[in-house]
Amino acid sequence: MPGWSCLVTGAGGFLGQRIVQLLMQEKDLEEIRVLDKFFRPETREQFFNLDTNIKVTVLEGDILDTQYLRKACQGISVVIHTAAVIDVTGVIPRQTILDVNLKGTQNLLEACIQASVPAFIFSSSVDVAGPNSYKEIILNGNEEEHHESIWSDPYPYSKKMAEKAVLAANGSMLKIGGTLHTCALRPMYIYGERSPFISNTIITALKNKNILGCTGKFSTANPVYVGNVAWAHILAARGLRDPKKSPNIQGEFYYISDDTPHQSYDDLNYTLSKEWGFCPDSSWSLPVPLLYWLAFMLETVSFLLSPIYRFIPPFNRHLVTLTGSTFTFSYKKAQRDLGYEPLVSWEEAKQKTSEWIGTLVEQHRETLDTKSQ
């Protein structure tokens, strides 16, 4: 395949950075453009100091700026779109999430058409499939079962509608000829080094005598390591550029999991952190049906107060369902069409993540030592 170029949106994020790292090893790749609204100084420096012959262009811009997006897409072969606002707690305003996740994706698709970018890979989420009820049990589900979220909460709704827009855009005519080919990847809950969710869990536990918060004791999930999700994006980029593989991938979506054991979110947090003296919360937990009812009451109060006060419930029905369900999916379709096999084993992923958690513990100790001086 001839030399090519790739634009990665959300490149300063947890997943985006890992995708860029793997792209550096791709043959015939001539340029990577990394786009985000804001890069931390250390991330920006990391991109500038990469030991590579590949041209790396750092772009800071808003995904809602259509003119900027069009310039960013000029001369690009593949767009990998990971930029998103992730919030299942209701803290971030609904319109902000819809603007970035849905409108931003629509803007980027239009920019690709105007700049004649032939391939578009969308980082979707398992949230677009559900779970819709904590009573529903999905074990090793697959794409043919056509699960679809019915939640109106902004994150699952915006990702679902954005994915629909991406897949509907497959086959669109490009401005100077040719066709846009798209696909979407639906990773499970992503863990690994620099996970913002795990980081928050650990930092909170460090302030609570190393007791891990209870976030999903009654769930059964199949978490996926960030390096394996990034690898799936690389394979999708290869596949859409390969004339033999591309027809099977165009307009398709894929669940991305790996060989991480099925477990609850609480068990995952404990397994990854127990080496550093963390322990699970042994206190009694409310059953899921009661939590769901309480969430409904809190949401009702929030709605009634909304004309005069913005009350954000500590949890909502979507979050209770998400963290109280059995909801797992197979990666067989990605294996068949993309040639996907997990790049990193569970044991290696566990070790890498645990070692990183150790650095968080050390940083916390150093902070306490500094304050005590």
UniProtKB/Swiss-Prot annotation:
Alphabetic keyword roster: Endoplasmic reticulum, Isomerase, Membrane, Mitochondrion, Multifunctional enzyme, NAD, Oxidoreductase, Steroidogenesis, Transmembrane, Transmembrane helix
EC number: 1.1.1.-, 1.1.1.145, 5.3.3.1
Subcellular location, record wording: Endoplasmic reticulum membrane; Mitochondrion membrane
InterPro entries assigned to the protein according to its UniProt record, in alphabetical order: 3Beta_OHSteriod_DH/Estase (IPR002225), Lipid_A_modif_metabolic_enz (IPR050177), NAD(P)-bd_dom_sf (IPR036291)
Highest taxon of source: Eukaryota
Primary residence: endoplasmic reticulum
Disulfide bonds: none
Signal peptide: none
Positions contributing to NAD(+) binding: K159
GO molecular function, one term: steroid Delta-isomerase activity
Its biological purpose: 3-beta-HSD is a bifunctional enzyme, that catalyzes the oxidative conversion of Delta(5)-ene-3-beta-hydroxy steroid, and the oxidative conversion of ketosteroids. The 3-beta-HSD enzymatic system plays a crucial role in the biosynthesis of all classes of hormonal steroids. May be involved in local production of progesterone.
Name of this chain's protein: 3 beta-hydroxysteroid dehydrogenase/Delta 5-->4-isomerase type 6
